[in-house]
Amino acid sequence: MLTEIRNCNIPKMKRYDHLFEKICDIENLRKAHKNAKKGKGWYKEVQEIDKDPDKYLEQIQEMLINHTYRTSEYEVFYKDDGRKKRKIYKLPYFPDRICQWAILQVIEPCIINNLTTDTYSAIPDRGIHKALHKMQDAMWNHPEECKYCLKLDARHYYQSINHDLLKEKYSRMFNDSELVWLLTEIIDSIQTADIEDLTAIYLLEEDVDPETGIPIGNYLSQYSGNFYFSSFDHWIKEQKHIRYYFRYMDDIVIFAKTKEELVELRKEIDVYFRDELKLNIKGNWQVFPTF
């Protein structure tokens, strides 16, 4: 019988407040410009802003404080990563990329503090190599408990992230209406892209709901994508008591003693994905022996 998911007693998320004023602080904006322009000094936009940085940064500050900031139109292009073509969304350097850096410089510690130690994507000092090392360490040092592996990921993950649910998650973490306004503006900004291009995208993506999706390429998106899964991480670790669990964005690996327990767990994960995250498991999930 599947576990009751909605009534599970997951610890309350820590809430943070008074962050918007830190984002708008001119020193934070100066730092954001410094970080955002790394490796991009040849950009015409960067060179223009560098002639009088504070003039432009004060414009961003005014947009934020007055709530007149609106996400610019996206440039959409395709990138072949060797397995498939991915749609990448690119925003102008000014004001958008500076703005997103200013946000992440303040909220990144809050997001990371909410994640378990079992997730490795978009986190400083973790990454794919550390994830692989941890998996290898588990298999070699605890072979009896890691005889079988469940491997799965979400179908069309970035395209399927539900806007309302993501905004709700941020609202639970940030007791700051102005910060929530700013995050909402960026989360919903995919609707400001070219309508014809969006229509083509959704036709290509079959049953992708046009009310969902965050843009691959946005600096904020990689953190939002990681944060969206945080409740699942806590459920797996604290309610299901899964010891050998590893997540890199939506790619999930779980080790266990028997095939049967992983098959049963996969059924429960399927329910959690649908009911709590509004996602679907991709059809190529596997359970297989590790040795």
Set out the residue ranges of the language-model regions.
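Glycine-/proline-rich flexible loop or hinge segments
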Residues: 36-47, 79-90, 114-118
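Conserved pre-motif C helix in the palm subdomain of viral-like polymerases
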Residues: 86-116, 209-238
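Reverse-transcriptase-like RNA-dependent polymerase core
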Residues: 63-84, 98, 182-204
